[in-house]
Design a protein with these regions (language model features):
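Glycine-rich phosphate-binding loops of nucleotide-dependent enzymes
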Residues: 1-200
Length: 200
């Protein structure tokens, strides 16, 4: 089996500070890979490079055996690399559905969607409900409730569901259990297992 994601000799400096020094990794389909190290070891920088938020000074990234380079997280997402950031990058004042489709809204068919850009809220809600159900997040009763009303573990679940909903090949999670209790941490680890079982 060939690795889905390969990083070779990735380096990044900020002035004289070396944030990442010749980092290498191989990730295979369905593999869960943990990156561990001391504070300041470059873990977050590596994640930011792999998801397109930071451009490395040197090195290369291969996705499905092809060399890729990203100038933004949007480019990485387009190629199938999704990220669940430590802060989750959710908007608390928006609903679960709105957060899952933020920046990727489904428009209505025909004139209303094409020219007036009306959103297909029903299709988005159905898809959000389906994704949350696939990940076993049935404790969320109302798909339209605001994210700010959810527990930490439920918010993490929404972020994971969003990351796995759009043709994803790789999901990168930055400290997925940070600031969560034992029960919520266990549920997040179960979510990771469920994502892995889907071959992501």
């Amino acid at each position: 089996m060939e690795p889905i994601l390969v990083a070779k000799n990735l380096s990044k400096k900020y002035g004289k500070v070396v944030a990442l020094d010749d980092a290498n990794l191989e990730l295979y389909p369905g593999e869960v890979l943990g990156v561990i190290g001391d504070n300041g070891a470059g873990k977050s920088t590596l994640i930011k490079v792999l998801c397109g938020a930071v451009i490395p000074d040197s090195g290369e990234i291969l996705l499905d055996g092809k060399q890729v380079s990203f100038t933004s997280p949007i480019e990485a997402r387009t190629l199938g690399i999704e990220t669940v950031y430590q802060n989750l990058a959710l908007s608390p004042a928006l609903s679960i559905t709105d957060n899952m489709f933020l920046g990727r809204e489904i428009r209505q068919k025909g004139f209303m969607g094409k020219f007036l850009r009306f959103l297909d809220k029903k299709a988005m809600a159905e898809e959000a409900r389906k994704r949350l159900s696939e990940l076993g997040l049935l404790t969320i009763q109302n798909i339209n409730q605001l994210v700010e009303t959810l527990s930490g573990g439920q918010r993490q679940g929404v972020a994971v569901a969003r990351a796995t909903s759009f043709g994803t090949k790789v999901v990168i999670m930055d400290e997925p259990t940070a600031a969560l209790g034992v029960k919520e941490s266990r549920r997040v680890l179960e979510l990771i297992g469920e994502v892995r079982a889907r071959g992501i």
